[in-house]
């Protein structure tokens, strides 16, 4: 916020803190479209992926976007905080026959990992929170380089990104891994040829949908880039109240780990 306020000086713009004023609800899963339709949000089927539109709710406006953090068909709804409870009740009533239920962070984290999505300060450290220079990551180093348009006008970091690309100074690469066995490798060290430390797993799980042991890891280039073979992870697994070290083979795996056609189907499927 201080940075935004400083940047606004000299411009005809107002910066306001609205964190407490706006409530967000995520409706995710194969029946999400049908629930919105049954809740009375007419024409919500016209929304394509990343589209958003305003709809009427309880004397106010709710912004609905076809987005989400699960890799499945889903929507996110933003409404004035005072209307959040009535919106919740409206959705729960419309979804009762379809088994709607609230989920917690553990379930959401599993879904986002299967979708290959990354989390700030979990899979990478943001510039705001990084204390050590070697913890910083450029967009290209966390798989987000495609979001940076080098032809765009000036923006913070523009020169540094172009220089790193031109001089091949990118030091890390974020990759998906498939790991042998079924023991999650969260926070495991990644080795090359079982001896040279080359990276760290930031998120990992046994995926019930992909039926694979999956992970996201940050590796030091050229590992994960031009060198992709003979990678191993060091896992410490609890065995009868004692930790046992396991060295498991890992291979580079494309993300997302699962791909659901219904996520991008137009019009959305009616489950």
Predicted segments — roles?
Residues 1-271:
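Conserved, structured C-terminal
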């Amino acid at each position: 916020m201080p940075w935004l306020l400083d940047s606004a000086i000299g411009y005809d713009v107002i910066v306001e803190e609205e964190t407490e004023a706006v409530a967000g609800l995520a409706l995710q899963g194969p029946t999400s479209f049908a629930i919105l339709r049954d809740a009375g949000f007419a024409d919500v089927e016209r929304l394509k992926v990343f589209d958003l539109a305003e709809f009427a709710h309880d004397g106010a406006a709710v912004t609905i976007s076809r987005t989400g953090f699960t890799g499945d068909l889903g929507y996110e709804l933003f409404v004035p905080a005072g209307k959040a409870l009535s919106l919740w009740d409206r959705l729960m009533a419309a979804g009762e026959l379809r088994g709607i239920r609230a989920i917690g962070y553990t379930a959401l984290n599993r879904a986002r990992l299967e979708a290959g999505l990354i989390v700030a300060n979990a899979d990478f450290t943001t510039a705001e929170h990084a204390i050590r220079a070697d913890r910083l990551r450029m967009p290209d180093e966390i798989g987000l380089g495609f979001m940076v348009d080098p032809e765009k006008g000036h923006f913070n970091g523009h020169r540094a990104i172009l220089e790193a690309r031109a001089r091949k100074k990118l030091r890390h690469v974020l990759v998906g891994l498939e790991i042998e066995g079924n023991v999650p490798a969260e926070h495991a060290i990644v080795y090359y040829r079982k001896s040279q430390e080359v990276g760290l797993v930031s998120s990992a799980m046994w995926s019930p949908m992909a039926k694979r042991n999956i992970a996201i890891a940050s590796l030091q280039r050229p590992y994960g880039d031009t060198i992709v073979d003979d990678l191993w992870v060091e896992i410490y697994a609890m065995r009868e109240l004692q930790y046992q070290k396991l060295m498991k083979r890992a291979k580079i795996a494309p993300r997302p780990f699962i791909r659901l056609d219904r996520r991008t189907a137009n019009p959305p499927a009616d489950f």
